[in-house]
Amino acid sequence: MSREDFSDTLRVLVATDCHLGYMEKDEIRRHDSFKAFEEICSIAEEKQVDFLLLGGDLFHENKPSRTTLVKAIEILRRHCLNDKPVQFQVVSDQTVNFQNAFGQVNYEDPHFNVGLPVFSIHGNHDDPAGVDNLSAIDILSACNLVNYFGKMVLGGSGVGQITLYPILMKKGSTTVALYGLGNIRDERLNRMFQTPHAVQWMRPEVQEGCDVSDWFNILVLHQNRVKSNPKNAISEHFLPRFLDFIVWGHEHECLIDPQEVSGMGFHITQPGSSVATSLIDGESKPKHVLLLEIKGNQYRPTKIPLTSVRPFEYTEIVLKDESDIDPNDQNSILEHLDKVVRNLIEKASKKAVNRSEIKLPLVRIKVDYSGFMTINPQRFGQKYVGKVANPQDILIFSKASKKGRSEANIDDSERLRPEELNQQNIEALVAESNLKMEILPVNDLDVALHNFVNKDDKLAFYSCVQYNLQETRGKLAKDSDAKKFEEDDLILKVGECLEERLKDRSTRPTGSSQFLSTGLTSENLTKGSSGIANASFSDDEDTTQMSGLAPPTRGRRGSSTANTTRGRAKAPTRGRGRGKASSAMKQTTLDSSLGFRQSQRSASAAASAAFKSASTIGEDDVDSPSSEEVEPEDFNKPDSSSEDDESTKGKGRKRPATTKRGRGRGSGTSKRGRKNESSSSLNRLLSSKDDDEDEDDEDREKKLNKSQPRVTRNYGALRR
């Protein structure tokens, strides 16, 4: 190619479904995905392409591990950051194309020397999630290593509305409009394409010397292409006719040669995955990447094989078609399967390009055992440990379909994918249960369940509850003064708020929930809870189990405090926190968090009395009775019991205690009985009436003041 042709030719290397981090726990296959991605980047450097185009699923997990992220960043740094000049320009509005904090293509940043730009959309494995709608690719984008595009903001009502803005590139006389569409749930995107004006395509504006028809239009998407169920896939005929070339991700079978779609005028390439993640027939085909050279409105594809991919051999056998197998003899079945496996291993070794780096092959045999007995696949694979990479799942058994149910007679609507079928069943079960909930909408629980199971979001349900509670609080606070509500009126008001929120949700897309949070930490929890004005108190039991932020306490003091908190659970007063972090915890129940009080006077009095008695009981529960059981004259009498003297002497010494951990030292009485006595006396204190609260408070203060020397002695023994 001459220098003039090179200056007008845009060279692009296309790859999809790298699945970095796949099988990272497997000692044999843990490096396969990284070696394949390293080879792809090396090919891009060797072929001197203008940029690398990735079609989604760069990562295998929605939350990749730190090891996976570090290795991915290392590979991109080695191959993308250099002093090579970038030969093309981005002439479109970059703030629209790249929706991040910087809003520009990475090679235009003056602080970075980017020699190989990488453009990528997200797939179904690494799609954005959480309150901030971020994905793992956003991390690479923030590192200025990847240009992340194709992230759609679903707006409008019903199924939603999306607008696709192209990245306009120009190299010499060649102009390219690159459209990106990150993964959207197939059923929803299918409905959107069939809804008028739900999907809008923005075309380049007419400029001097450049008409709209002069642009070469490329689309990169990551969706189902299989025709098994039309509702769970995207048809090529949904796409606009002005497109010239389509890169189709998500399908792992390598169909790298561009195929023309009849009646549409564009070509489709399906590069497939660079690492085998499902051991099926389609994955056994050789893996390739595509070198796409564009000049004007013409393009030239060149497929390049990947040599670092682990060899994979797949075959299917029907036992009844084999004449040398006895249906009643298991040994004959084993001998035949052993022979097939050995042949596949030998076949894989012959395909090895570099003999010095022969890898253990992947072997999969699909066995139709109709009329025969099965064998244990794991026991069968034990003899091939060290010979194949997947000894635990070499065999997969199946039976022939019943008569009259051939594949030709199966309707397309009945060919549901197993994972899609199960997902529909889960949603249907939740919907059919008809839960009569007053705060949480069922749709929000569906989304939380999806993120908890599929995206490993451990705080999905907690975020769902917190978001709906805050939304309910806000609506109640806007209506009227919360303190004027009675309990019955509050329940009715909450029900009305739920109906209003359900109406609002019905006008918004189902996937636009704001409560999901995949990155909640203790700092975020503290910030979020502090924003709720005058409506929170420490809930030791619930918040400690939910977030695990309350620090452990020492001795009986912490346990007695927890007991007093449980004893006051019915009173809408402030509870005592166990540590500094407990002040940031908020109870997730509605009544307490809103701060409704049935009787403010009695509640405040009970709270002060409970606080004083709780501190006394918590510090003196080793061998002193409750404040109600002790008469005033008893405090003036000396302790004549030898048992008390011994316990007092023991407390004065700092020697190893023989009692249990966290209990009072030197006490010979039953700790459980003391604990019950203190909690029962506290309950009696809290149940006192308003008419005699003042007298009780005065008597109680006198008793507490008199018992202070005893408390001080025990407190010093417990603190050590």
UniProtKB/Swiss-Prot annotation:
GO cellular component terms, A-Z: chromatin; euchromatin; Mre11 complex; synaptonemal complex
Protein name: Double-strand break repair protein MRE11
Positions of the catalytic residues: H125
NCBIfam families noted in UniProt: mre11
Compartmental location: Nucleus; Chromosome
Species this chain originates from: Arabidopsis thaliana (Mouse-ear cress)
Recorded GO MF terms: 3'-5'-DNA exonuclease activity; DNA endonuclease activity; manganese ion binding
Subunit and partners: Component of the MRN complex composed of two heterodimers RAD50/MRE11 associated with a single NBS1.
Note on cofactor: Binds 2 manganese ions per subunit.
